[in-house]
Amino acid sequence: MSEEFKSLLSSDIIPENWYNVTPDLPEPLPPPRDTKSDFSSINLLNKILPKEVLKQEFTFKRYEKIPDEIIDKYIQIGRPTPLIRAKNLEKYLDYGGKIFFKFEGATATGSHKINTAIAQAYYAMNENANGVTTETGAGQWGSATALAASLYNLKSQIFMVRVSYEQKPLRKVVMSLYNSSVVPSPSNLTEFGRKILSENPDHPGTLGIGISEAVEYALDHNYRYMVASVMNAALTHQSVIGQESIKQMELLGEFPDVLFGCVGGGSNFGGFAFPFLPINDDIEIYATTAQEVPKFSQGEYKYDLMDTAGVLPAVRMYSLGADFVPPKIYAGGLRYHGAAPSLSLLINHGRIKSDEVTEEQVKNAIKTFANTQGFIIAPESGHAVATAIKYAREHKDEKKTLLINVSGHGLLDLSIFSD
């Protein structure tokens, strides 16, 4: 192993602090709002979130010290993750510049999700919670929550969106191996789930419904709710991705001109792209969503509910509406109606550009990446790669350096190619 390669994977690459984008936004982040006169969703957060997570959600501090115990856990689960030059992809595309990718699929659970799951489970443990609960789409977040809970000897209850529960049975196996209880959502475990099922016994589920069920369960069982995405604390914890990428690129004597990431709620994208913002005002940034969930092109930038039941506060974001039921698409992690307020604000200001790609483009991108670089990537990550491939073909003679965040591997998502 070369010294350069060893340096790129040294534990010294892991940052000492999380980065919070709030102080560097072009305008103050609009605060969350209560939507009911007889019930405070904002006060509810005090009951379901670990106090330290809630503090990080509303802080204006640019940096937050990462506890040593969390850094130790980061090392245990595979951080820092590799940053690799995609030379074969460059050759295949006849691209005149360089293409790099950050591979979050190298973590223990195969995606970026574990970065914030470990932090939130650590804070829940410190509060002597009975356990943790959350929703999951494709199962990556559920797997990360299950592992993080296991590492801190906490119980975990996962509400998995029904369509993904049926499409991705091996994700259930992973969560069960980590001693988690997993049910399809909507479920009979909660009053809200039972209400949805009474109206439509075959409801495919949505992330918004899963959130509502998990919050209800947390209140009833003295569990802490684990925030998968959208909320600023989750994006802050994910900033290890971007900060590692910056250090690794510097070690290679490189710096990207263009960044690419996929967006469900925005956590992997924000964690990857946001740390670059204060460093370079000219860097181009592309956020890719599924064409079937066109939140940035057809959604409104407005105050809207984060969950279907309206238990959580409303936030200002790009949204297709909290009652939007996405098609049963191949990328369960992108079936969310909204996007993180910080990301939405930056897109509204034009600082970050958005793109939408089709299922065919995503499948072609996954196949191309597999046959050039060898990695079978997650369908969600395939969206970012599809946009990067499109960009490289349209700008092949500009010799720009491209950096893609590959948020996870796709080894448990192969059913999309079995049709």
UniProtKB/Swiss-Prot annotation:
Gene3D superfamilies: 3.40.50.1100. Pathway: Amino-acid biosynthesis; L-tryptophan biosynthesis; L-tryptophan from chorismate: step 5/5. Disulfide bonds: none annotated. GO terms for cellular component: cytoplasm. CDD domains: Trp-synth_B. It catalyses: (1S,2R)-1-C-(indol-3-yl)glycerol 3-phosphate + L-serine = D-glyceraldehyde 3-phosphate + L-tryptophan + H2O. One of its GO terms (molecular function) is pyridoxal phosphate binding. It comes from the Archaea. Its cofactor is pyridoxal 5'-phosphate. Keywords: Amino-acid biosynthesis, Aromatic amino acid biosynthesis, Lyase, Pyridoxal phosphate, Tryptophan biosynthesis. Its EC number is 4.2.1.20. The modification N6-(pyridoxal phosphate)lysine is found at residue 113. InterPro entries: Trp_synth_b-like, Trp_synth_beta, Trp_synth_beta/beta-like, TrpB-like_PALP, TrpB-like_PALP_sf. NCBIfam families: PRK12391.1 (NF009057), trpB_rel (TIGR01415). The beta subunit is responsible for the synthesis of L-tryptophan from indole and L-serine. Tetramer of two alpha and two beta chains. Belongs to the TrpB family. HAMAP family: Trp_synth_beta. This is Tryptophan synthase beta chain. The gene is trpB.
